[in-house]
């Protein structure tokens, strides 16, 4: 019986040495929201708490300025 190998999660922002997450960096922010528009929790992404707070604030600012959608495209 094979054991399940879980990959270790790491914080991408710590590894890259990011000081501040910018709300205008849409490509980065899109990778942290689901296709329905929800913010992905840090227990799934592995983001540290400090950067998760910055990330959620940046996503909310980008949504307010219509850079990111609140929800997916309704058909």
Swiss-Prot record:
GO BP of this protein: translation
Gene3D superfamilies: Ribosomal protein S18 (4.10.640.10)
One GO cellular component term: cytosolic small ribosomal subunit
Function: Binds as a heterodimer with protein bS6 to the central domain of the 16S rRNA, where it helps stabilize the platform of the 30S subunit.
Family: Belongs to the bacterial ribosomal protein bS18 family.
Subunit record text: Part of the 30S ribosomal subunit. Forms a tight heterodimer with protein bS6.
NCBIfam families per the UniProt record, alphabetical: S18
Protein name: Small ribosomal subunit protein bS18
